[in-house]
């Protein structure tokens, strides 16, 4: 070529390696874009919950509304910022980072939507904890963190990315603190 580079011609008959059908289905995700990658729904719900949670807390704290909380308003606010907002943010980060660390496909579609629903169920359970009882609320709330931890461990181990198993320490601390 004129620029001193060699021209490389590829054969038009090159065929990509066969992709197992299960991976091809997951790679060609055609569902809602919101559930294509973990950061999308979890960063969204974290942002929304941080605003809604603060508004509810301020109104509850000043007696403008009465939420059926099984704890005082300040404890509820602290709990929701840690186990609602922070947990959703960590979930969004991990579900986006782990595929990059492991080379595996991201958790998406109905499995990701299921995790989001577990997170939402935890928020509702804590919000209604005076009605459903503290034990039931705690059980529902911690189920999200347990599910997230199991997904994270499964993906990290399947990808043989042992050095990133240390992120599990953060999830274990959150789980233990939430029990």
Predicted regions mapped to residue ranges:
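Hydrophobic alpha-helical transmembrane segments of multi-pass integral membrane proteins
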Residues: 2-179
């Amino acid at each position: 070529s004129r620029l001193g580079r060699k021209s490389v011609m590829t054969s038009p008959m090159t065929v990509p390696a066969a992709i197992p059908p299960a991976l091809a289905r997951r790679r060609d995700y055609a569902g809602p874009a919101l559930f294509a990658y973990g950061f999308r729904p979890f960063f969204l719900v974290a942002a929304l919950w941080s605003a809604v949670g603060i508004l509810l807390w301020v109104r509850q704290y000043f007696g403008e509304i009465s939420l059926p909380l099984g704890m005082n308003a300040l404890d509820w606010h602290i709990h929701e910022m840690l186990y609602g907002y922070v947990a959703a943010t960590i979930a969004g980060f991990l579900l986006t980072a782990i595929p990059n660390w492991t080379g595996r496909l991201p958790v998406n579609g109905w499995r990701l939507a299921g995790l989001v629903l577990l997170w939402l169920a935890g928020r509702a359970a804590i919000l209604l904890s005076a009605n459903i009882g503290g034990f039931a609320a705690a059980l529902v709330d911690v189920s999200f963190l347990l599910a997230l931890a199991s997904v994270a461990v499964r993906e990290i181990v399947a990808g043989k990315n042992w050095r990133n198993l240390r992120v599990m320490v953060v999830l274990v601390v959150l789980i233990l603190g939430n029990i």
